[in-house]
């Protein structure tokens, strides 16, 4: 059976949790392959229960599914334990969660440096969540990071923390005028936290590949979105990892030839949290309508999301860089009760038309959207379960997005619930 990659095709917050939850009953494994607790998935169960997950894969809510925090993820031990406790309190079985021995740990000094750096930059800040994600990935690439497996050997953990703080404390004290961190205190804190997750540490790359060899289905769940990818996103206003489909193989240990489907998640309009270019951003009553009707508040940050019309330029770009085979279009219901719905089909940059993503980020900043208008609809579509049950104008809107994006729209979300979905084509194949 296949490995399926699920990836956001915009700037994150597209509704990936809903897609994972919908597929959950057909899956045996769900894997987070990058990022950390700087992203959030919201899942609404058929009984109305709502779960906001930041680190643990969405498959944890589906009985019988084994969930993996992969080697490409950076893990805050405290956040992991808090999230597990919250799920346990609500009766969710968390026994089938595994943690890659090679995932990196977010240490207290990563969080401290992240927060003071953003304050130091002031108006020039990137807009990070301040959770230590970037500094942890920096240490990973500099080969001075602390990995999950290090908590199994106190001597190695102590050596790594002491070596790291020789430099980090200089930065905190001499540049940012903050107090130095005590190495032993950091070690003791991490070891105490490790008591709550040591039993979950595993060679997950081996287990995942063996699962595929047995014919089981594995979903590789990305966080954030394509335009936040450190290589392919709107740099420097990006995350510190690779949410794109190429990152799925690296962050899980599954070879790329074992991935048969790349499911992109597209919101029927566009949103973004934090700083950075956003060509279709709205500052009028339409933007307010999308934000209010769509409930556009960041799951992790609590920050209001910026809103705009659908951008086909970035959708085509996402299709290309991810090799997307299918799309799940979410929040189509939010667009009900609009007379007309603009779609951005290209950019105008200083009088030059771009139908594809400009190479220069300066051009992306200066891009003005070129719109094509589609007639809207006023009907309530939340009860539609087949494509034909949608109003004709809603059908035409979906088909136009499909044409512009360059991949088949296999699923359509018409409400927040798991069952409020239209399936046009099975993505597990």
Curated annotation (Swiss-Prot):
UniProt KW keywords: Cytoplasm, GTP-binding, Ligase, Magnesium, Metal-binding, Nucleotide-binding, Purine biosynthesis
Residue sites binding GTP per the record: 12-18, 40-42, 305, 331-333, 413-415
Pathway: Purine metabolism; AMP biosynthesis via de novo pathway; AMP from IMP: step 1/2
The protein's Enzyme Commission number: 6.3.4.4
Subcellular location: Cytoplasm
Gene Ontology biological process terms from the UniProt entry: 'de novo' AMP biosynthetic process; IMP metabolic process
Cofactor note: Binds 1 Mg(2+) ion per subunit.
Major localization listed first in the record, in broad terms: cytoplasm
Active site, renumbered: 13, 41
CDD domains per the UniProt record, alphabetical: AdSS (cd03108)
Job of this protein: Plays an important role in the de novo pathway of purine nucleotide biosynthesis. Catalyzes the first committed step in the biosynthesis of AMP from IMP.
Protein name according to UniProt: Adenylosuccinate synthetase
Species in which this protein is naturally found: Rhodococcus jostii (strain RHA1)
